Amino acid sequence: MAREYKIEDYRNFGIMAHIDAGKTTMTERILFYTGKNHKIGETHDGASTMDWMEQEQERGITITSAATTTFWKGPDGRKRRFNIIDTPGHVDFTIEVERSLRVLDGAIALLDANAGVEPQTETVWRQAEKYRVPRMVFVNKMDKIGADFYRSVEMVGSRLGAKALVLQLPIGAENDFEGVVDLVYMRALRWDGSIGAPATVSEIPSDLKEKAEEYREKLIEMAVEVDEVATESYLEGVMPTDEQLVALIRKGTIEVQFHPVLCGTAFKNKGVQPLLDAVISYLPSPVDVPAISGIDVKTEDEVTRESSDDAPLSMLAFKIMNDPFVGSLTFCRIYSGKVQKGISLENTVKKKRERLGRMLQMHSNSREDIEEAFAGDIVALAGLKETTTGDTLCDPLRPVVLERMEFPEPVIEIAIEPKTKADQEKMGIALNRLAAEDPSFRVKSDEESGQTIIAGMGELHLDIIVDRMRREFKVEANIGQPQVAYRESITKAAEIDYTHKKQSGGAGQFARVKIIFEPHDGDDFIFESKIVGGAVPKEYIPGVQKGIESVMGSGPLAGFPMLGVKATLVDGGYHDVDSSVLAFEIAARAAFRDGAKKAGAQLLEPIMKVEVVTPEDYVGDVIGDLNSRRGQISGTEARSVSTVVNAMVPLANMFGYVNSLRSMSQGRAQYTMQFDHYEPVPSAVALEIQKKYA
């Protein structure tokens, strides 16, 4: 089977947005306009195509990124292949967003025309910035009360620190929103609002003529800056043609120099087709972005893999899903080469071979079996046993490890126990399966109480895990009160000289270590050896590091993992017969226990960035309540009919906040919360925590 579409005609992109910015509706419209869906599913009635998991449909939020392949004929009449990855907009699922951004070539950031740039938009934007993903902005919900296109554009600059390149102006707003002024071709596009209706093209309305001229001039000035020749011509008074302008906008977008901004309303079917045309005109194909780099397993050199069918096969597993019909599905982005059903793949991270059974092309939740796939494709593989998120699969003869994904540490823990004996065994299987799908979800066993503890990114995250366990694995469980994932650290340097000696007939044990423990700015553990003259033989030094690392998971105050510790081995002593790696491990462990106390151990707690959007009447109550939760108010900001309150609040004081806020504002205020940083716990609170966990 030969390649159906040239790789230059692929667009792998995602839609990123704050919860409720209309992302699912937009994806539905795109699938409808590109001919995949016959009946549009509205999120309001829980029938949306992309939201294929039951709970997503109930809660009206998108959780898992489902990959969908569809097609669109561009302005030039040529058909392109779109692989759309749906990303969740809720804060507890930033991990999903991170995974999808990792395998995208471009993205559309969706803004709510009334709210503009919201906190989750900022978070996702920063993640996209990290991977240098070219982005366009679509100001959605232009038909909504309080819709303000120009304020949204201003916020792209002020809140995201990004350069907005305005390509369209709205004609009317709120109920009177009719269409857009296209600044590239200087024309008006209007829609009657019926599903699938094409735009009618007309002259720019006279009251917008002057504004359109002004914005087109700004557009040209920004676009020519990306090319020296175009800049020179422009300064000499030569204007770029429409085709040249499109090429300049494409170049600047792909180089992430600016972000094209369009507008419309997906729900009312206005502005969707020009957005699809813009995906083709301005977002990159797999060959327009830098080739992915990785490490050659044989030589350990850095290598790149070009987006070409002739290059050695390399693909990245970015998502694992349980499918009721096929079992476990591993979603992969093919970066280079081609893959056929039935071949052997090397998993270079796990150092295991995988045999490829079925290969599927996914459309939301229908699927099509395929025999072969090529560079640039996004496919779902069935039957892989060892592969987890972030692993590289490649040609066994040309092994490579692509860049690893990094996942955040969970901030909240809950004890969970099966309701019946029958649920006991099934619960373990279910939790392990769910943890394989989601690297930000962890399962562990509490050694003292024997309880199973699940940890995640927030209350909603863990709610949904428990819910999925019930639905997909038929496991009923009781859950305890959420607990905060505290951490411990040290505040000053301490030098410990410790000798471990044991004589018990025959060979004894002997090891002496002198270690300086001190705090450092990062969260990780740093070990350094400054041993000179063989005071501790080289082969024993790894034992010292291993010994310290083995007790880093349990701090001296309340047994929480330690953060930000640096240990420097400066001196020591050994015995020719009695010393061993194990003896040095034991000595280092004891030295750390002493050192952590002497170095001023302290408890740390997760601090959450909280944003509350509330009607003005309740601002005083909201601020008073946040203060009572040990919150620090960092600012308030007025938005059309509501006020935004920003604060930093300890997670320990935010449990059950949703109910308090609801009753305080008669259900009219909303909030979002995400982990920001760790901070020392006030001493009075720290004592209570120590008593509780001692």
UniProtKB/Swiss-Prot annotation:
GO terms for biological process: ribosome disassembly. Residues 8-287 form the tr-type G domain. The keyword Transport does not apply. Gene3D superfamilies: 3.30.230.10, 3.30.70.240, Elongation Factor G (Translational Gtpase), domain 3, P-loop containing nucleotide triphosphate hydrolases, Translation factors. It is found in: Cytoplasm. Keywords: Cytoplasm, Elongation factor, GTP-binding, Nucleotide-binding, Protein biosynthesis. GO terms for molecular function: GTP binding; GTPase activity; guanosine tetraphosphate binding; translation elongation factor activity. Catalyzes the GTP-dependent ribosomal translocation step during translation elongation. During this step, the ribosome changes from the pre-translocational (PRE) to the post-translocational (POST) state as the newly formed A-site-bound peptidyl-tRNA and P-site-bound deacylated tRNA move to the P and E sites, respectively. Catalyzes the coordinated movement of the two tRNA molecules, the mRNA and conformational changes in the ribosome. NCBIfam families: EF-G (TIGR00484), PRK12740.1-5 (NF009381), small_GTP (TIGR00231). Belongs to the TRAFAC class translation factor GTPase superfamily. Classic translation factor GTPase family. EF-G/EF-2 subfamily. This is Elongation factor G. It comes from Bartonella quintana (strain Toulouse). The lineage of its organism: Bacteria, Pseudomonadati, Pseudomonadota, Alphaproteobacteria, Hyphomicrobiales. The gene is fusA.
